[in-house]
């Protein structure tokens, strides 16, 4: 099957929805951040501390390209589809869905998470600024937008229906 890439801000529900969706569709779900941690042999905070965000983004690009060829459901990291290159790869390879969740909801989920170095080391205002900057990029790199206000099972069902009628020639 062609991949389904889930994108959106940190804490929008990509990983949760991805697991449910993969189960419904009988395929694998890859959490891109988890894959990078497993491949690098260290946590994302350790990668950031040791090599910096730029190196992490390079690993993210490599992982995204690998899963573009494999398929399944890919829960991207919050910054994975910000680059033009990654956005094009994802749109060309599969179906991209932006889970559009209110900032306050995302913030409530991520504000104290030490495994999210950007969130953990940023103020609420800095994260809101990042959210506002990223949202138009998620929109530009997505085929579909689904409200993150629904329960995860509903979001997964909506994505499954979209996938069944998606025209893969439109990437």
Region spans (language model):
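Hydrophobic anchor at the beta1->P-loop junction of P-loop NTPases
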Residues: 6
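Conserved glycine(s) of the Walker
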Residues: 13
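Short, well-ordered alpha-helix to beta-strand connector turns
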Residues: 70-71, 93-94, 141-142
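ATP-dependent small-molecule kinase phosphotransfer cores
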Residues: 32-80, 84-88, 116, 124, ...
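NTP-dependent small-molecule kinase module
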Residues: 16, 20, 24, 135-171
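P-loop (Walker A) phosphate-binding loop of NTP-binding proteins
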Residues: 9
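Short glycine-rich anion-binding loops that position phosphate/pyrophosphate groups of nucleotides
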Residues: 78-81, 102-104, 151
